């Protein structure tokens, strides 16, 4: 397979495997679980634990404590520039603020904003998606779930008109004037896309200018920055920020344009619990206020329930099952859906 055809999670696993192949006895891993599905994350952590038993030293920087703590020999917390050794792990987890609870879905019209009929897509000589049938309803929060490489990001790109299907048809019902095929400037005024890599869409010299670029007013840009907890970063250059901060800025900048359809690809990577809480509250506040439609791709169990009215499970390029929030529990449990 060509590396350009790999999913974000597969690329993450490839990079980590390349680092392990160097056989260096000291390994420094910065958020190695980013974009990994639950089985990939568990396999990686078990592999790293095996290496430590062979004399390797492994240092991991990670926000997803529930996946890391069972494998860690020591835990250190960086707070206000100082390292503190954590001996009470239960207290550490208890101190983490819980992610936002799912808000009750408002009564919504069963009105489609987009339909996909028999959609397929090929890249690098491989079939990535095949026979995808899906309806996205106006005002809903739809979650796309599945293992790494199953086609979630590819499906999101087709919905965003960043690529065209090689089979089947995608129809939009946002506005007839937008047509059915091209991703025009007018299209992207109504449809917001947040990529896996925030570096791909941060281009202004300051955070304030980034958020204000597509906002209807300076006051609204300021409101968005307050919602996403990034006011204190206003004068910073976006590319000088941490990955988690970049992620919040990129989402805030797209949200400031008030899109009717918001497509999010792994929006919570790099977020600590407080950042996660702020991000989810901001997204759901805007969703309730504007009635926008949100489609999210995620492997992060912490956020899934708060961004889901309905979920679709993908396997090997096909939608295997759709359901409500109960599908989230199946996806992270031992259900046969996996």
Predicted feature residues:
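Conserved ABC ATPase signature
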Residues: 2-6, 237-241, 245
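Hydrophobic anchor residue at the start of the ABC signature
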Residues: 16, 251-252
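ABC ATPase C-loop
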Residues: 20, 254-255
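Catalytic Walker B motif of ABC-type/P-loop ATPase nucleotide-binding domains
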Residues: 27-30, 262-265
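H-loop/switch region of ABC-family ATPase nucleotide-binding domains
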Residues: 62-63, 298-299
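Helix-to-loop junction immediately C-terminal to a conserved catalytic motif
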Residues: 160
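ABC ATPase NBD Q-loop/coupling interface
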Residues: 169-186
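Conserved ABC ATPase "signature" region
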Residues: 219-233
């Amino acid at each position: 397979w060509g590396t350009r055809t790999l999913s974000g999670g597969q690329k993450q696993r490839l990079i980590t495997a390349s680092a392990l192949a160097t056989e260096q006895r000291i390994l420094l891993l910065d958020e190695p679980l980013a974009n990994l599905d639950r089985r990939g994350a568990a396999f990686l952590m078990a592999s790293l634990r095996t290496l430590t038993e062979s004399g390797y030293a492994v240092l991991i920087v990670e926000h997803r404590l529930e996946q890391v703590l069972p494998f860690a020999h020591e835990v250190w917390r960086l707070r206000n520039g100082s390292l503190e050794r954590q001996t009470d792990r239960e207290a550490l987890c208890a101190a983490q603020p819980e992610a936002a609870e799912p808000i009750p879905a408002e009564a919504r019209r069963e009105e489609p904003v987009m339909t996909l009929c028999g959609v397929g897509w090929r890249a690098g000589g491989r079939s990535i998606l095949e026979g995808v049938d899906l309806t996205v309803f106006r005002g809903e929060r739809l979650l796309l779930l599945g293992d790494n490489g199953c086609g979630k990001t590819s499906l999101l790109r087709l919905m965003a008109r960043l690529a065209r299907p090689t089979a089947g048809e995608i129809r939009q019902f946002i506005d007839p004037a937008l047509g059915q095929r091209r991703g025009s400037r007018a299209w992207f005024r109504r449809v917001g896309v947040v990529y896996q890599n925030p570096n791909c869409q941060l281009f202004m010299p300051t955070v304030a200018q980034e958020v204000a670029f597509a906002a209807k007013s300076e006051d609204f840009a300021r409101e968005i920055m307050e919602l996403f907890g990034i006011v204190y970063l206003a004068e910073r250059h976006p590319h000088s920020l941490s990955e988690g901060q970049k992620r919040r800025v990129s989402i805030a900048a797209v949200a400031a344009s008030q899109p009717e359809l918001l497509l999010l690809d792994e929006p919570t990577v790099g977020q600590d619990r407080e950042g996660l809480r702020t991000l989810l509250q901001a997204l759901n506040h805007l969703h309730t206020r504007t009635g926008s439609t949100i489609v999210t791709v995620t492997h992060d169990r912490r956020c899934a329930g708060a961004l889901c009215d309905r979920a679709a499970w993908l396997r090997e390029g096909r939608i295997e099952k759709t359901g409500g929030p109960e599908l989230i529990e199946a996806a992270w449990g031992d259900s046969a859906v996996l």
